[in-house]
């Protein structure tokens, strides 16, 4: 029985997948805390779709996929900020326009040059078959993002919580928004290998949303989100070995189950908890 439970750890590809997924899940969850604070969940969705043309172009020209995806994500994020600043359109309309346009462009590129692009890897991810050079790329991305987040997390928090106060103390909202979108784009690129373009949105939203239901303090929220993101990613890869199922699907399903538990039973904001308190107060 013990041998069966430890079997996944005897394979190098499983160890690589579990370690890498844990790191990606943790850093994406850290960013999800800020998305919850600002109400920018849709932007995570936009970036997860917007990197597709960058990946397709990179594959077509035999370039590192991470390079193309990163610049496509940055271009999408800057486009959202620019269109929002010069037009009367609401933010959700701008986000919807950008991500649908970029995703359509990516599908067009794939259809024009289908042999150069592994569509399944883009859409669904392939963490179990990740190449060593991709591991190095993802490791560098995660390391740089983590260092920058640890250096600027307080400044980002102030920008997201109160821009007026941030300007008063000499911070530039535009600079820090660009920094955040750059980090988010980089982490989306890292998560592509784990869960694919479609499910990246869950990695950068669900842990933060779950933690948001459990606490009102940002620092605690971030810690809970990181733990949830890292643990579900590790366990998801582990379970997928026995299920012989899609790794990304298992990871996101676990995160969704934890969200539902928090949604129903959170001590302060849980649906059943609030209903019980309402009945007691009658």
Swiss-Prot record:
One of its GO terms (cellular component) is plasma membrane. Pfam families: ABC-3. The chain crosses the membrane at residues 17-37, 63-83, 93-113, 140-160, 164-184, 186-206, 223-243, 245-265. It is found in: Cell inner membrane. The keyword Iron applies. Its main location: membrane. It comes from the Bacteria. InterPro entries: ABC_BtuC-like, ABC_TroCD. SUPFAM superfamilies: ABC transporter involved in vitamin B12 uptake, BtuC. Keywords: Cell inner membrane, Cell membrane, Ion transport, Iron, Iron transport, Membrane, Transmembrane, Transmembrane helix, Transport. One of its GO terms (biological process) is response to zinc ion. It is a multi-pass membrane protein. Part of an ATP-driven transport system HI_0359/HI_0360/HI_0361/HI_0362 for iron. Belongs to the ABC-3 integral membrane protein family. PANTHER family: ABC-TRANSPORTER METAL-BINDING PROTEIN, IRON TRANSPORT SYSTEM MEMBRANE PROTEIN HI_0360-RELATED. This is Probable iron transport system membrane protein HI_0360. It comes from Haemophilus influenzae (strain ATCC 51907 / DSM 11121 / KW20 / Rd).
């Amino acid at each position: 029985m013990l041998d069966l439970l430890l079997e996944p750890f005897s394979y190098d590809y499983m160890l690589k997948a579990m370690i890498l997924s844990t790191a990606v899940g943790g850093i994406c969850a850290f960013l999800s805390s800020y998305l919850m604070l600002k109400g920018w969940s849709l932007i995570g969705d936009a970036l997860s779709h917007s990197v597709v043309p960058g990946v397709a172009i990179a594959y077509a020209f035999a370039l590192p996929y991470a390079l193309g995806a990163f610049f496509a994500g940055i271009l999408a994020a800057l486009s959202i900020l620019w269109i929002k600043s010069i037009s009367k359109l609401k933010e959700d309309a701008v986000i919807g326009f950008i991500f649908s346009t970029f995703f359509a462009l990516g599908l067009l590129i794939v259809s024009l040059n289908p042999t150069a692009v592994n569509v399944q890897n883009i859409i669904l991810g392939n963490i179990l078959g990740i190449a060593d050079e991709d591991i190095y790329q993802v490791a560098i991305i995660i390391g740089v993002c983590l260092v920058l987040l640890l250096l600027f997390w307080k400044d980002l928090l102030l920008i997201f919580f109160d821009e007026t106060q941030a300007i008063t103390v000499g911070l530039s909202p535009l600079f820090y928004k660009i920094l955040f979108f750059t980090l988010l784009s980089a982490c989306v690129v890292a998560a592509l290998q784990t869960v694919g373009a479609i499910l990246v949105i869950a990695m950068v939203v669900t842990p933060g949303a779950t933690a948001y239901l459990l606490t009102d303090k940002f620092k605690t929220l971030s810690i809970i989100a990181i733990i949830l993101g890292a643990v579900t990613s590790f366990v998801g890869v582990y379970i997928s070995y026995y299920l012989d199922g899609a790794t990304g699907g298992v990871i996101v399903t676990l995160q969704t189950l934890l969200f539902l538990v928090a949604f129903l039973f959170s001590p302060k904001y849980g649906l059943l908890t609030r209903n019980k308190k309402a009945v007691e107060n009658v």
